[in-house]
């Protein structure tokens, strides 16, 4: 620790901190464009200049100078830094004037307007005149693909996008060429970006040079209602903000959550909102003479009642269902003496104790891991944000091993093999220097445990974990899976045979399976997907942004999602549909609202009470 004085405020900070970080500890605002706490230091925008008393005669870039480099005063007094002196004020005005020399006056038509760092800092630290009389520089826009829109005349060369794609996303397709006035950000050889994290450069760009192509010219930020909630496109449970205008979702942005997604989200999460408007089920349908026709809720519920009474019933829980809706379905099917299952990906995960399906590691363990073993998973595709964590560990010196098909994971790894023999080899090998006395995490993909011998493979992995003192992280691919297993939504025998032998299958949003001809299928879901095409009766429900609910992510973290907008047409919340159906069946579920449902849920599974808000 070292004592320094910033603007006459004395404080003790870690000597490894930069001056900018020390200013943040002292709650002193220092403007910046190129600096970002999750990227390497570039020091090229010069907006964060401060005065070091007794130091260099010129202002110093606070993002690049560490506290340990400060010299004490002539009499041994603590080093002194000024952020509001006349020297600093003039330096910032000069830097801002240079930044605006070639910047176009696009603010009225720029998508970044209203949330632009350049606008805010020009108002706070700039001047109200320009001495530049020459023609502004013109640059050609880049084609980075269908997701990221470019307006390169607005670029201020902060290089955040270059550093993110190189350091976090792990691709080398962007860089800076030229010097001085000829410097420009470009993609090498005119390539489009090949990353499922590329949308994050839109958030990182401090100006309007990189914007969202699907969102372009659709709304202004002050027109949008902002709701903090949880992503369900994978099992990580990333914290997100859903921005809505009226009844429509306009965009999805990440929220900083160090323990889960840091401040990144995958492109699937970011751009899925356009699918919330298409192929929506907005009214009940029933099948007559092989064709679906529009129906009404009373007619649909009566038909469901007639089919559910007296027949064998089996319930399926899809990937996006909340814990409350699965709990309500379970209670209803128990009343009907039926069965149910949530492991529709075929994962051989025992339900005996929570560690068997929720693992023993948390996502943050990857940050400190010195050895990571990936078994039967491609995290780059299955959970891109988690893959970025593994890459960060690799960049910090962690050793990575892979058992499974080799692929480009954006980091180096030792390919041990791709079958069960490779696991046996790992179990029999002596604890070498790669693992011995090191923090180790085993990432287990569903691909490793969804075959016939899945239980045996999982047992083998557990033996490897025990012998190497490793933690296990199960790479679930469905947001609903851990929560459903928490409440016991599993079948003891072969659920595929149970579905075939059922008279009625109640499908709660499961679009990832094919149900063979035979049973009467009731599909409760939000989109006209595979499940709706097979259904004999469709009950339209809300999507994940249209209802509040609990989700449990792959590490077992209980999270609370909030409703951002309302469902279209006659679609209802999932739990409310099941409650209404139970009333028709004279097997009334004991709750009339979501609060009462949660009280019943927490009464049986009290660990779900401690939900973490996004």
Predicted regions and their residues:
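N-terminal export/assembly segments and adjacent metallocofactor-ligating motifs
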Residues: 1-16, 21-24, 32, 36, ...
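Acidic, glycine-enriched active-site microenvironments
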Residues: 5, 48, 63
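Short, glycine-/polar-rich solvent-exposed loops and beta-turns at beta-strand/coil boundaries
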Residues: 35-44, 66, 179
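Short acidic beta-strand-loop surface patches of small beta-rich interaction domains
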Residues: 40-44, 49-56
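Structured interaction patches on ligand/partner-binding surfaces of diverse proteins
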Residues: 63-72
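Non-catalytic alpha/beta scaffold blocks inside enzyme catalytic domains
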Residues: 340, 344-612
């Amino acid at each position: 620790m070292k004592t320094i004085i910033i603007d006459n405020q004395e404080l003790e900070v870690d000597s490894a901190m930069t001056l900018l970080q020390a200013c943040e500890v002292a709650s002193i605002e220092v403007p910046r464009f190129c600096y970002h706490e999750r990227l390497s230091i570039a020091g090229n925008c010069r907006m964060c200049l401060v005065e070091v008393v007794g130091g260099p005669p010129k202002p110093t870039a606070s993002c690049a100078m560490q506290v340990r480099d400060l010299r004490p005063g002539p009499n041994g007094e603590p080093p002194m830094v000024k952020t509001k002196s006349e020297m600093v004020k003039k330096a910032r005005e000069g830097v801002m004037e240079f930044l605006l020399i070639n910047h176009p006056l696009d603010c009225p038509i720029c998508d970044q307007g209203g949330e632009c760092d350049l606008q805010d800092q020009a108002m706070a630290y700039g001047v109200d005149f320009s001495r530049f009389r020459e023609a502004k520089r013109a640059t050609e826009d880049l084609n980075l693909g269908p997701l990221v829109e470019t307006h390169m005349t607005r670029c201020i060369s902060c290089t955040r996008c270059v550093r993110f794609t190189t350091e976090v996303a792990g691709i080398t397709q962007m860089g800076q060429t030229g010097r001085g006035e000829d410097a420009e950000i470009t993609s090498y050889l005119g390539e489009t970006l090949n990353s499922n994290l590329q949308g994050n450069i839109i958030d990182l760009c401090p100006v309007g040079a990189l914007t969202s192509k699907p969102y372009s010219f659709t709304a202004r930020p002050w027109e949008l209602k902002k709701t903090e909630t949880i992503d369900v496109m994978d099992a990580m449970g990333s914290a997100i903000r859903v921005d809505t205008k009226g009844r429509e979702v306009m965009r999805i942005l990440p929220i900083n959550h160090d323990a889960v997604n840091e401040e990144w989200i995958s492109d699937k999460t970011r751009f899925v909102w356009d699918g919330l408007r298409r192929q929506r089920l907005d009214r009940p349908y029933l099948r007559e003479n092989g064709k679906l026709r529009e129906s009404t809720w009373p007619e649909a519920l009566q038909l469901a009642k007639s089919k559910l009474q007296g027949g064998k019933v089996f319930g399926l829980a899809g990937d996006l269902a909340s814990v409350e809706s699965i709990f309500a379905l379970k209670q209803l099917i128990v009343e009907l003496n039926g069965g149910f299952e949530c492991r529709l990906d075929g994962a051989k995960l025992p339900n005996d104790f929570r560690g068997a399906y929720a693992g023993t590691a948390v996502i943050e363990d990857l940050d400190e891991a010195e050895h990571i073993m990936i078994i039967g998973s491609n995290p780059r595709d299955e959970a891109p944000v988690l893959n970025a964590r593994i890459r960060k560990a690799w960049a910090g010196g962690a050793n990575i091993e892979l058992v499974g098909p080799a692929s480009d994971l954006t980091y180096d790894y030792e390919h041990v093999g791709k079958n069960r023999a490779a696991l046996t080899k790992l179990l029999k090998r002596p604890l070498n220097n790669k693992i011995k006395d090191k923090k180790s995490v085993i990432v287990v993909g569903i691909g490793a445990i969804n075959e016939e011998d899945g239980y045996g493979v999982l047992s083998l992995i557990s033996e490897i974990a025990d012998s190497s003192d490793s933690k296990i992280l199960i790479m679930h691919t469905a947001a609903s899976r851990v929560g459903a297993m928490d409440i016991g939504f599993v079948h003891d025998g072969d659920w595929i045979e149970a579905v075939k032998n059922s008279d009625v299958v109640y499908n709660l949003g499961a679009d990832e399976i094919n149900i063979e001809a035979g049973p009467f299928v009731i599909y409760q879901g939000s989109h006209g997907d595979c499940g709706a095409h097979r259904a004999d009766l469709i009950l339209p429900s809300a999507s994940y942004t249209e209802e509040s609910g609990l989700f449990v992510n792959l590490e077992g973290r209980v999270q609370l999602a909030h409703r951002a907008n309302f469902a279209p047409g006659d679609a209802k919340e999932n739990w409310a549909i099941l409650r209404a159906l139970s009333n028709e069946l004279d097997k009334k579920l004991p709750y009339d609202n979501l609060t009462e449902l949660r009280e019943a849920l927490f009464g049986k599974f009290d660990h779900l009470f401690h939900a973490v808000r996004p």
